[in-house]
Regions:
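Short, Gly/Pro- and small/polar-rich lid/capping loops
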Residues: 1-37, 44-46
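Beta-strand-rich binding-surface signature
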Residues: 28, 42, 51, 122, ...
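Glycine-rich, flexible beta-strand/loop modules in the N-terminal catalytic cores of phosphate-handling
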Residues: 33-35, 40-119
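A short glycine/serine-rich beta->alpha loop
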Residues: 90-94, 127-135
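Short, conserved phosphate-binding/catalytic loop or strand-edge motifs used
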Residues: 121-127
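Glycine- and Gly-Pro-enriched alpha-helical subdomains that act as flexible
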Residues: 135-151
Length: 151
């Protein structure tokens, strides 16, 4: 059975992936916490060729005040890919994909943050994708979790 033009080749003849890893080899991971001095918590992660920076700010007052919840705090997450993070420059405006990933990350992190201890406040989590190379969603969630733990 030969390789068709429509087939995706994941391994070369020697069993090496296109990114240079062997079949059972995982991506290199590097995590640093506390990298932003003006944030309450922050993290920098390199996950393979992905480079991600996350910052946590808060709890702080909600603006405008009418959005405040009297029973619990609010968690806001923003996942943003820099225009230079991918090989073909992307539009800097938030894409539908970025908005959806922001919501997914918020839903994943919300149970871990004790928002009931911070009524009428907001905790902002900003995630910047500096370089993307597959798996940036998972790495972004990891960066946000480390930044929250650092806060």
């Amino acid at each position: 059975m030969g390789v068709k033009k429509t087939d995706i080749v994941l391994l070369d003849d020697k069993g090496i992936r296109c990114d240079g890893r062997k079949i059972g080899e995982t991506r290199r991971i590097m995590i640093k916490a506390g990298v932003l001095k003006n944030a309450n918590g922050s993290a920098y992660i390199e996950f393979g060729e992905n480079k991600i920076l996350a910052g946590v700010f808060g709890p702080r007052d909600v603006h405008p005040k009418h959005l405040a919840n009297t029973d619990r705090g609010i968690l806001r997450c923003r996942y943003h890919m820099q225009p230079y993070s991918v090989s073909e420059r992307k539009n800097p405006a938030p894409s539908r994909r970025e908005i959806e990933i922001s919501k997914v990350i918020k839903e994943a992190l919300e149970p871990a943050v004790m928002l009931e201890n911070f009524p009428r406040t907001v905790v902002d989590v900003f995630i910047e994708i500096l370089q993307a190379d597959g798996g940036s969603r998972c790495a972004a969630l990891d960066a946000a979790a480390v930044a929250l733990a650092d806060a």
